[in-house]
Amino acid sequence: MQKGIRLNDGHVASLGLLARKDGTRKGYLSKRSSDNTKWQTKWFALLQNLLFYFESDSSSRPSGLYLLEGCVCDRAPSPKPALSAKEPLEKQHYFTVNFSHENQKALELRTEDAKDCDEWVAAIAHASYRTLATEHEALMQKYLHLLQIVETEKTVAKQLRQQIEDGEIEIERLKAEITSLLKDNERIQSTQTVAPNDEDSDIKKIKKVQSFLRGWLCRRKWKTIIQDYIRSPHADSMRKRNQVVFSMLEAEAEYVQQLHILVNNFLRPLRMAASSKKPPITHDDVSSIFLNSETIMFLHQIFYQGLKARISSWPTLVLADLFDILLPMLNIYQEFVRNHQYSLQILAHCKQNRDFDKLLKHYEAKPDCEERTLETFLTYPMFQIPRYILTLHELLAHTPHEHVERNSLDYAKSKLEELSRIMHDEVSETENIRKNLAIERMIIEGCEILLDTSQTFVRQGSLIQVPMSEKGKITRGRLGSLSLKKEGERQCFLFSKHLIICTRGSGGKLHLTKNGVISLIDCTLLEEPESTEEEAKGSGQDIDHLDFKIGVEPKDSPPFTVILVASSRQEKAAWTSDISQCVDNIRCNGLMMNAFEENSKVTVPQMIKRTREGTREAEMSRSDASLYCDDVDIRFSKTMNSCKVLQIRYASVERLLERLTDLRFLSIDFLNTFLHSYRVFTTAIVVLDKLITIYKKPISAIPARWLRSLELLFASGQNNKLLYGEPPKSPRATRKFSSPPPLSITKTSSPSRRRKLSLNIPIITGGKALDLAALSCNSNGYTSMYSAMSPFSKATLDTSKLYVSSSFTNKIPDEGDTTPEKPEDPSALSKQSSEVSMREESDIDQNQSDDGDTETSPTKSPTTPKSVKNKNSSEFPLFSYNNGVVMTSCRELDNNRSALSAASAFAIATAGANEGTPNKEKYRRMSLASAGFPPDQRNGDKEFVIRRAATNRVLNVLRHWVSKHSQDFETNDELKCKVIGFLEEVMHDPELLTQERKAAANIIRTLTQEDPGDNQITLEEITQMAEGVKAEPFENHSALEIAEQLTLLDHLVFKKIPYEEFFGQGWMKLEKNERTPYIMKTTKHFNDISNLIASEIIRNEDINARVSAIEKWVAVADICRCLHNYNAVLEITSSMNRSAIFRLKKTWLKVSKQTKALIDKLQKLVSSEGRFKNLREALKNCDPPCVPYLGMYLTDLAFIEEGTPNYTEDGLVNFSKMRMISHIIREIRQFQQTAYKIEHQAKVTQYLLDQSFVMDEESLYESSLRIEPKLPT
């Protein structure tokens, strides 16, 4: 009997451990058992040609060993599945290992992954020792061959060295021989007689020619070497690096000058003023406004001197040590940054002092300031660190990786980027204050309401104001006329609380019009103003529904009405939607603030403030902490938005979508920023799906923390005095209304401070109005409500005249007055209600009899004509539902009077007309008025209110989206179809209110119809007309024609840029033509026009013709300046500064002094100095239409993008950055949306678009050298 082979068990175990650690292939495989019935999963490890398997990957001792030498490994086909097989064969991949021994059974293995199977087969196939030995042998043969080659080369090298040594010896011998020959030659020449003179002169000439040739050859060789280096990449990189440093020196000199003006013109004089007998400002305020300003000036003076010293040692420029000096002082900048917002707030507060404001204007009028304001100088340090980051980026781009300064510059950039992120947040948060102060400075009369730092700027633009008496006389043709444009054009500025209406005066300054400061809290917006039959006949279709009306009821002056006309339907929709949203924000703030103060002792917006005195802990515990407390997925800034809620600094996409659909408030500034920037962090479909979810499942879709806040609206069970206040002691005069009137509830204890809370009461059914104060709170609530409602089928109700008793109206602590007890008989209330109804009907009839009267009392509202009922409107505010017309109206709430409870107000605001609604549903909607109903009934009312609010929110967001961002739907058919489908589904909802259905229909109409207001020719049509047509020469067109058509072309190119291209710096990326095609087209158009102007000047051979061309183009530039086409001004001035034109000294000597002075004026206007400060001032002082220089905005966007990523390290969206970019886009779109009224002239545009004679840069310079050659030096 043959004995088994003995193996060293310990050695095998150690090899197994080595395989576990360093094996070439490891993992789980399924192995077929010896009886071919089962598959066992083992952990295999391959080490060279040894295959170990273990019970698991944690086993320390191998279960078996296979010697793979001489084996063959191949993939095996999958076997036919058995009927009882449970595992799917498509996830099993087989391979076999066949051994060379005939009686040895093949090893069958399988894996679940095809890739894993192939890798195992390849690893086993290469595990043979024989293969390794063969490869080793081949390598040894190659090694021996290379050794032979090396030996041969060594022999050859030795021979060459020997030849070189022999050559050197021969050279030395020849040198000695030459020396001896020269000595012999000198000796012979000294003994010989002197040669004839003519022979000497010939030799001298030959020598001179030889010397000249030698010098010429040397100079030519040297010139070639220099030119080769100049054209080399290294020299180009060094030139660019030096250019960056020189630009940095100029920028630093300008910045030091700005700091010098800030300190010497403002800080030091104000310190002296604070020490006077009657100081206009205190030393503490001076320190708060100018914190660290003087220290920063000293720091940069040192930095600037060091930079100048480095420049003096050019071309060796070492800059890293300069930044090493700057970096330790960054804490000074950090203190300045953190104080920046507080600084501007203190400045705004101090400007309310007339003496200080007068003194400050005196300082700002100094020539050094160049009409720049103090807040502008205070903002300059905020932009310096981003400028350093851009400079370091450019320096690093042109600094080799092995450069000694590379690491130091990288470190400086990283440190500055950390500070830059903080600065961007601070600049974003203070931008609103700076914008308000800038507008206030533009108004000659001043505007104190803009010094309120809580005001949020929303939009600005040009509108035409139409007097009421001329409403029917204005026609579309006259709207475009110069006479009405002069008389009626207004510059309108919308803020979160006010609308400012101004006229433009000389020098770009603004003048407030009469009643030009409109408080939105007193406003009623009517989008489709009513018109009588005579007015309709007079106006016809000319005005084309571009006008809207704002009714204003100030508390201390007579009411008045403002009619404004937009230039297009899109502009009108943007204005009305923003005004409506601002009014809704004020109304929501007022209602909720009053409700929370009376209901839960928590005040909105104080419920989200962390500094409220006395009730801080109670507020934080009882309100929604997610509105002000930072969390892992959201972080807040210090400033508040228009809804008095902390602005979001960073947030996740989900939290941003939550804020968009938060039913408690919707800030207009958040909404505009979100709609501008959502493409950066999400898609339109995701946003739409979120809105659809909120509409379909409002209760389950909103977070639980919202419900806790919303439930405070329904906590009226213990404070019914809010609903049933004391009766007024004197009845108020009634007013006539053809639509439902405002609900006025007043407190009679302080009649001198009485204000009205106007809410539009919805029509429940058949024109009946509901008065919540007339409803009973007992168990027979339905009966009493029905009896109270029945008389009002044709009448409307003013609750300020009602005297309602209730068992729940107790003594109000802060007034001390008592109310009568409620009658026990339920019929008493019905009787009382009927008496009230009769009084109301008599009053209404009396008012209807004097229909032509006009009410002008400060306590009364403007009459709403009957014709309003038949108007359709796209307006859909949060709390306003009238039958047939939508009006936004609100009043400031007074803390000293009783007010409507939040539950009642919310019910009134969200109920509406719905014909055919069952009585039970009507009563259920009104049950919020009674705290005596069961809890399940109140829960049902709460759900109804939330559903109405959710529907309102969805339609409101869609309205803003469709009216302001129509291009989203023009370029995305899927989104457009999905929105239309959703709105059609909404319209078929049987529970939808009439006004909600109208709002949905208006959005669909806006999506499907084209705006007929813009009939301007398109750029494509102009380009198509210019193709294949020979253009007339430059001399055939006047300067005015060229300027007008150039302005038309520039604006058509500029207005085509979609705002999504301004995100992400796509114009600086490699794929810029794909990411930002319209920005690149604008850049190409700018360069084409500049090349055209330069080519037109250069191609004139005659010097007088060139002078004439220059003067004509300068005249074109000046006309473009008058047309506010600053892009064309820069196109023309940049072409004049090109080297091919600038070097024409003879030509420029013949150009007149007036033309040269005009060129200097235009160049100063569009100069990039001070971040285009002169151009920005010109844009601020001009009215659209206008074509700004796009590069200015791209520079601003680059400053924002550099060092501030779109996402934080935690993956949160940088919403502060989105807000800053959105504000820049808002300004760009203001200029894009206002078109020029210039008639197209095909012959001129054909010349401007003709590229047949345009030369490139090199050809231009060659032609310039040909017409005026270089003068010899």
UniProtKB/Swiss-Prot annotation:
Q: Where is the composition biased (Acidic residues)?
A: 842-854
Identify residues that carry Phosphoserine: 577, 626, 758, 779, 800
Composition bias (Low complexity) maps to 855-867
Record-linked CDD domains: PH_RasGRF1_2 (cd13261), RasGEF (cd00155), REM (cd06224), RhoGEF (cd00160)
Keywords from the named record: Guanine-nucleotide releasing factor, Phosphoprotein, Repeat, Ubl conjugation
Please list the residue ranges annotated as the DH domain.
Answer: 240-426
IQ domain sequence ranges: 204-229
Q: PTM comment for this protein?
A: Phosphorylated by PLK2, leading to ubiquitination and degradation by the proteasome.
By its UniProt entry, which InterPro entries does this protein fall under?
Answer: DBL_dom_sf (IPR035899), DH_dom (IPR000219), GDS_CDC24_CS (IPR001331), PH-like_dom_sf (IPR011993), PH_domain (IPR001849), Ras-like_GEF (IPR008937), Ras-like_Gua-exchang_fac_N (IPR000651), Ras_G-nucl-exch_fac_CS (IPR019804)
Q: Where is the N-terminal Ras-GEF domain?
A: 644-761
Region described as Disordered: spans on this chain: 724-754, 809-874
| Keyword Repressor belongs to the record | no
- The Ras-GEF domain covers 1038-1270
Oligomeric form and interacting partners: Homooligomer and heterooligomer with RASGRF2. Interacts with USP8, thereby regulating its stability.
What is its biological role? Promotes the exchange of Ras-bound GDP by GTP.
Question: Domain comment?
Answer: The DH (DBL-homology) domain mediates interaction with RASGRF2.
What is the protein name stated in its UniProt record?
Ras-specific guanine nucleotide-releasing factor 1
Q: What gene does the UniProt entry assign to this protein?
A: RASGRF1
